[in-house]
């Protein structure tokens, strides 16, 4: 029985083995014990500070603050980020259980990120069924310098990205199996992702677009039946996610105004506010500074061909 189970799960075991080997190759096992540093170290420190302040100052969820005294005329650190600080609060709870160690923050962020890569493998496995390509394509994403660097960092972006991947896995299962429970699981995961980083709402917007196209009869996603069967619960769940995240952003704006905090940005910086020269400058920055940090040129060519 054990041998049969191992044969059935050998693709998962092989992938996890490769994932562990690559993680060690990237020195994840050593980096976990480092404090915030290098690129984006100021925002890393902000996140670490938010978690530590919860731990030190009473676990008041709606009173986030940092150690940087930029609020209330330079007398407090009360400042609220645009993301819902559930992640930082949970880190503070772990500090309560195990004591304050920065490695806890990095370790949790790393585990969530690697879980996201694992679910990316599951997505490929679900659709391709080919073991080699499922493993290879999932690990290919793990060659991105940007993902590798932020994957075990103090920023919540990588965790948000991971929860989005997991959410899409369950949405695909909903689409293929017509099981509504998978839709609601995916919505819960997208909520967690958007709570960690508001840009994760794009996943919800994409699904809302699918819903709109189907109910208006512009297209059909399921054979012989509608993909979105419920006319109330499905749109209500998507609206609820946007409402929860939007409500927090409004609260964050109010909280920051109340305490005179301008440290965190709780607004948008749309492209239409830029001049033509500024837009060209951004595109030049992407081409000259960042493009190869996303993926090696050979990978970009491969993805373009695909």
PLM region descriptions:
Residues 10-44, 49-52, 58-59, 239-255:
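Transmembrane signal-anchor helices characteristic of membrane glycosylation enzymes that use polyprenol
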Residues 26-50, 58-70, 78-90, 100-103, ...:
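Extracytoplasmic catalytic/substrate-binding loops of multi-pass membrane glycan-assembly enzymes
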Residues 46-54, 192, 204-221, 225-306:
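Transmembrane-lumen/periplasm boundary regions of multi-pass, lipid-linked membrane glycan transferases
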Residues 75, 138, 183-198, 204-209:
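Membrane-interface alpha helices of multi-pass inner-membrane proteins
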Residues 100-103, 120-143, 161-162, 181:
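Transmembrane-helix signature of polytopic, membrane-embedded enzymes
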Residues 104-128, 165-170, 306:
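Transmembrane-helix motifs of polytopic, lipid-linked glycan transferases
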Residues 125-132, 167-183, 193:
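Membrane-interface transmembrane helices that cradle and orient dolichyl/undecaprenyl
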Residues 149-160:
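Short acidic/glycine- and proline-prone juxtamembrane loop motifs at membrane-interface regions
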